[in-house]
């Protein structure tokens, strides 16, 4: 059974092909609101070919989106090119999670899929950290209850404000520096961004430990998760495909 999973985020659209639970290929493109459904359809066809599949091989599609305009174009492309009406992660979809928030309907589809992936792959209690355009932390208990969500600025968003808001600071790659003892502008920016953000991550995790009276693991996912997971012993699991695993489990719960 071949499931195409689509994660539409503010910065990137990531497409994953899941073959009987195995992630067979993932592809990342820039999120652009002005892409037409035909453009998305051509991309889907190309990505399928790169993974060794044809459009007719796709049995179903599931979409997680936080960008409604792009989601509508993508959905239209899937209907046209694959002749499939995709499942959308949102209200009415069974996840197996109990979202114990003040406004559960406002929880992002990406966060829901992340939490499902973390819980069904690794069990609870678990803290899910997603390093995307925004950085989110969501806590899932042993009985699959999502009891807390934290949202803050993503590292790329913060970094862009640094070089876009100053006249002479250049754009730099977000990477783990060799040393905090920087001796020129670019290394100084890289070290400053990295250690400032890493410190915020560790302080946030520490506060969860302080306020929650149980042991839990921390799983990191998202575009820059590897950079920070390698720099701290407070992150237990690195899983770049967590959202796709979550969408696979959500899909399975709704069709079986």
Curated annotation (Swiss-Prot):
Q: Does the keyword Repeat apply?
A: no
Biological process, per Gene Ontology: coenzyme A biosynthetic process
Pfam families named in the record: Pan_kinase
Q: Which GO terms describe its molecular function?
A: ATP binding; metal ion binding; pantothenate kinase activity
| Catalytic reaction(s) noted | (R)-pantothenate + ATP = (R)-4'-phosphopantothenate + ADP + H(+)
Q: How does it assemble?
A: Homodimer.
The similarity comment for this entry is: Belongs to the type III pantothenate kinase family.
Known function: Catalyzes the phosphorylation of pantothenate (Pan), the first step in CoA biosynthesis.
- Name the UniProt record assigns to this protein: Type III pantothenate kinase
